[in-house]
């Protein structure tokens, strides 16, 4: 998905990236209804909600608004699809994998359409939607397609005349709630392993960005997944999200979003039926640059690490700790990078930064920028909205940041780079870990012993060394502390979507 310096791996057989196509500027949105049982439904309430283009603030279309009765209907469909003897349950594991591969094929076919929809709905650059989000989505479905017929139990030796073995069985109906910053990619992270293991799914996309999920529903139907296997209910968190989290017939839920909402999801899951929960939440991610680092690499990776996707990443390098010997030079080069970052129309192939997702997020970022100024951080560049451009914010760099400032403590989720100074490893380890979060961390050094010491000491689910945002479908991802529970991606994700059953059979005689 991303290489060591933030560039994109395309995964083409010949190693050459596909050419960036032209976005479909006047794309007609075809799919806006609730998707249940491989069919399109209007909500029982009859309500709709609008989705807007953050670049222009213009309404894209209206989407059917689900509520609890629609979730109930979706769960009934998912339950029926999971019943013993159903077409989905009778399907062999190899065929499940083939369906996932075929879905990836259709995503490849419609890649430009999906990237266009993602850019319209989120405001992210088309360049990134096409090469990062869609590439990661395709690779995720293909990776888990390969796992479908390789999920195996074990034979267990015992001290009695029995045969003992384990089976890894699907959990049943799984709920999924996806965020607005990577709508399609996070959908793939949840849907692919769930289907690989033989589960059925009821999914709620973020209300700000429902369009790619609904388009994907059309591809799921086209591929030939049995009715009820995948159901998508657009709507709002307090209604659809709450109904999924608390539904007694949903056996597992996966959520990506804020820590505050994650707590509500986990509470609802425990109050209802103790459903299993996977949470991928917020982070205040340290990026540690040692004096012996390759400074060119460190500056570029830290820049991409915080400004990519308009800073709207749970993995953003939101606390950059730089050793005092190279602090001044690092700040100087970081400011140069920020001033050169192309901000503008996300459909322009040269644009690397688009608008923030909505007015609420835009206002929050500007308020935190003002707090940085008031609390004594040095504003090196940016620090305000782009003139006459709606929800666009200038790439912002602060130096002389201290740990007690709000821009160092709170999740900004915007294009703001706070740069802090440190003197030695023990100091920076303590400061880096002095947070309730533990999602990711990064280390830049040429010293292997130093890298391994920091990788061991940092309280984060992922530690990148001399790279940033290096995601691979094969590598598990998740957080420590209040950054979440469980793991997505990799073989570890399969455990989140299966139950282990132990079978013990009494024998007349124990075989050697």
UniProtKB/Swiss-Prot annotation:
It comes from the Eukaryota. The record marks 181 as: Transition state stabilizer. Its main location: cytoplasm. Pfam families: Aldedh. Keywords: Acetylation, Cytoplasm, Lipid metabolism, NAD, Oxidoreductase. The keyword Acetylation applies. GO terms for molecular function: aldehyde dehydrogenase (NAD+) activity; aldehyde dehydrogenase [NAD(P)+] activity; NAD+ binding; protein homodimerization activity; retinal dehydrogenase activity; thyroid hormone binding. Its EC number is 1.2.1.36. Pathway: Cofactor metabolism; retinol metabolism. One of its GO terms (cellular component) is cytoplasm. NAD(+) binds at residues 204, 207, 257-262, 361, 411. Belongs to the aldehyde dehydrogenase family. Catalyzes the NAD-dependent oxidation of aldehyde substrates, such as all-trans-retinal and all-trans-13,14-dihydroretinal, to their corresponding carboxylic acids, all-trans-retinoate and all-trans-13,14-dihydroretinoate, respectively. High specificity for all-trans-retinal as substrate, can also accept acetaldehyde as substrate in vitro but with lower affinity. Required for the biosynthesis of normal levels of retinoate in the embryonic ocular and nasal regions; a critical lipid in the embryonic development of the eye and the nasal region. This is Retinaldehyde dehydrogenase 3. The gene is Aldh1a3.
